[in-house]
Amino acid sequence: MLLIPAIDLKDGQCVRLKQGDMDQATIFSEDPAAMARKWVDLGARRLHLVDLNGAFAGKPKNLEAIEAILDEVGDEIPVQLGGGIRSLETIEKYLDAGLSYVIIGTAAVKDPGFLQDACTAFAGSIIVGLDAKDGKVATDGWSKLTGHEVIDLAQKFEDYGVESIVYTDIGRDGMLQGINIEATVKLAQAVGIPVIASGGLSNLVDIENLCEVEEQGVEGVICGRAIYSGDLDFAAAQKRADELNGELDNA
């Protein structure tokens, strides 16, 4: 089970939002590269970056901070990024800079042809971010709820060749209310590609519950507010996940 720390970038700083509201941003660090180093030193095996300004602007807005993070840890672990990815040129720029994966969200829903082109051009590097509330997909920084069913879209995107899906329950994100395990497993069972859970992770019990369903296709979980607020000890949580999955050498 991959525990993936999230570094949400707004105006070059590391912040956390409540339910995607840019006006409810808590600044946790003014040095995102140092924050990336901290999580890697604590045992992170992948990082999840979000360009929040980019998500709302539709183009990269935190390049300097992203490049600083990649300079710091990009040679050590895979780094994925979402937010504002609307063109093949942007994807190419990010992958050339050292990102392992880019996450396409709104554009995948609104312009499936773009997603198909991206999967063809950058096979193995494209993750789709599906944000949902009550099973319906949301777009545009969660501000618009569509009529699309999550599972229908996920199956279509799997056919396009996406590498995995980051599934966010937007009713829970940033609220420390617990992961929506049921909805995440339902999605994972409906597709043959890995699903990464997101939204609401609050404590060690969530990690233990996720480890129980890893074999259903839930590859990892994005760790946000809980690891910044101190509700979840990241290093201890990754160790516990490894113990549960038999990934620690007992010798």
Swiss-Prot record:
Organism: Burkholderia lata (strain ATCC 17760 / DSM 23089 / LMG 22485 / NCIMB 9086 / R18194 / 383)
One CC-aspect GO term: cytoplasm
Catalytic activity: 1-(5-phospho-beta-D-ribosyl)-5-[(5-phospho-beta-D-ribosylamino)methylideneamino]imidazole-4-carboxamide = 5-[(5-phospho-1-deoxy-D-ribulos-1-ylimino)methylamino]-1-(5-phospho-beta-D-ribosyl)imidazole-4-carboxamide
Similarity remark: Belongs to the HisA/HisF family.
Lineage, top ranks: Bacteria, Pseudomonadati, Pseudomonadota, Betaproteobacteria, Burkholderiales
The entry's keywords: Amino-acid biosynthesis, Cytoplasm, Histidine biosynthesis, Isomerase
Entry keyword Isomerase: yes
EC code: 5.3.1.16
Predominant cellular place of this UniProt entry's protein: cytoplasm
NCBIfam families according to UniProt: 1-(5-phosphoribosyl)-5-[(5-phosphoribosylamino)methylideneamino]imidazole-4-carboxamide isomerase (TIGR00007), PRK13585.1 (NF010112)
Cytoplasm is among the record's keywords: yes
Pfam families attached to this UniProt entry: His_biosynth
InterPro entries: Aldolase_TIM, His_biosynth, HisA_bact_arch, Isoase_HisA-like, Isoase_HisA-like_bact, RibuloseP-bd_barrel
A molecular function (GO) term: 1-(5-phosphoribosyl)-5-[(5-phosphoribosylamino)methylideneamino]imidazole-4-carboxamide isomerase activity
Active site: D8 (proton acceptor), D131 (proton donor)
The protein's name in its UniProt record: 1-(5-phosphoribosyl)-5-[(5-phosphoribosylamino)methylideneamino] imidazole-4-carboxamide isomerase
Gene Ontology BP terms: L-histidine biosynthetic process; L-tryptophan biosynthetic process
SUPFAM superfamilies in the record: Ribulose-phoshate binding barrel
Localization, UniProt: Cytoplasm
